[in-house]
Amino acid sequence: MPAHIISSEQQRGRMLCTPIPKLIVSLSIPTLASQLISVFYNTADTYFVSKLSTSASAAVGVVFSLMSIIQAFGFGIGMGCGSIISRSLGSRDNERADRTASSAFFFAAAVGLLICIAGLCTLRPLMRLLGSTETILPYSESYARIILLAAPVMCASFVLSNTLRSEGEAMLSMYGICAGGLLNVALDPLFIFAFDMGIAGAALATALSQLVSFCLLAWLFLHGRSIVRVHVRCISKRPGLYGEILLVGFPTICRQGFASLSSALLNNAAAVYSDAAVAAVTISNKVYLLVRSIVIGIGQGFQPVAGYNFGAGDKKRTRQAFWFSVLLGTAVCIVCAAVISLFPDEIMHFFRDDAEVTRIGRQALLYACAVMPLMGYSTYVNQLYQCLGFHQAATLLASCRNGLLYVPLILILPRMLGLPGVEMSQPGADLLTFVVSLPFQIWFFRHKLR
């Protein structure tokens, strides 16, 4: 065996014996880098496209809802197979891990192809549904058409990166994602301005970057750099495995799916006021997503640790992993909230030098900062249930923030408060999600981790 490739038993020993803080930090750093790079190149799209016009900037927010749909299925299938893989490796069932990874990879690519076909066939009504006004529509159609063509590659990449993370090889996962993200940032100004492609150039830069990430991740598997194998011979013919992958990943599908729904509802609610309102909430959401990506990156370091140790029967280390993640995530959120609260105008001006966009976006950022420190706890309670295979509760928790709690707020608050109601809806949902998560965490620790 080459020296650079760690054996499954060595990896198992690392996951079960390394001190929890050191282990989670070591796994979180590459996942954080991956998350931040992903958000960074999405934010780069917003930054460069905002230089075109306010309507073009708003179109990025509209198409973000579509990208959330693609991510819902790709990331959901990836998280589903990742949870099964980490628990399988923890219990020394490597054959099941190979079968799960291979089946999930080809399944995700097929789902991405279906999304591509369905989206292209219904593009104009889909863009209207997601919040495009007549002035935003030409930009959103141009952007979405190219993004849809990349959907199969995007979905498959999510499975490959989650497979690497689930076996504890978060650093390898980071390489592919970061390379694609950095390429995206380099190509954006080239395609948008130098080649005069406008918003279509931003979409093409994103699609090509996703393809590069996929090729790099696939290379790692083809050259034996992973513990888990992905091969057509390992594809399962048993429908039950696909059902289990979807069942475990369903909380993520719900969470991301509701993120798409909430984004569409937010765009439609803001569009009542102006394109500037849509652009403002798009930019403020990108900033909020940047912080959330840090929280999720820590959680992606936490999940394989919890899965391995719970699968091996070590409840104490599972508890320690949860609380360390909560403390780390909360500290990060407090720092980010403080920085954003001090410089809201400067942040909005960075993206779009428009007084109306800044005025609306500033208030949205301040509302978000008020509840930001609660984000880590509710996120990790949800991830705890999901990575340990408690599907129904995980699905319920995942549906709260962007669905069960958010949808009523975005439908009611704007009618009562006007534009401030639009800005307060997501922070309100975050606060309520924290309250709902408390009894779930207390029950789980008393009955499953005692």
Residue ranges and their predicted role:
Residues 1-31, 85-152, 194-250, 306-371, ...:
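Short alpha-helical transmembrane segments in multi-pass integral membrane proteins
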Residues 25-45, 146, 180, 209-213, ...:
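Transmembrane helical elements of multi-pass membrane transporters/channels
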Residues 29, 45, 81-82, 122-123, ...:
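Hydrophobic/aromatic residues in alpha-helical transmembrane segments
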Residues 36, 40-58, 127-134, 190-197, ...:
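Helix-terminus/linker motif at the lipid-water interface of multi-pass membrane proteins
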Residues 46, 54-57, 94, 123, ...:
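Membrane-helix interface/capping residues of multi-pass secondary transporters
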Residues 57-117, 154-173, 267, 280-344, ...:
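Small-residue-rich hydrophobic transmembrane alpha-helices
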Residues 69-72, 184-189, 214-218, 290-293, ...:
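Hydrophobic transmembrane alpha-helices of multi-pass small-molecule transporters
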Residues 78, 147-165, 173-181, 202-217, ...:
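Short runs within selected transmembrane alpha-helices of multi-pass transporters and secretion channels
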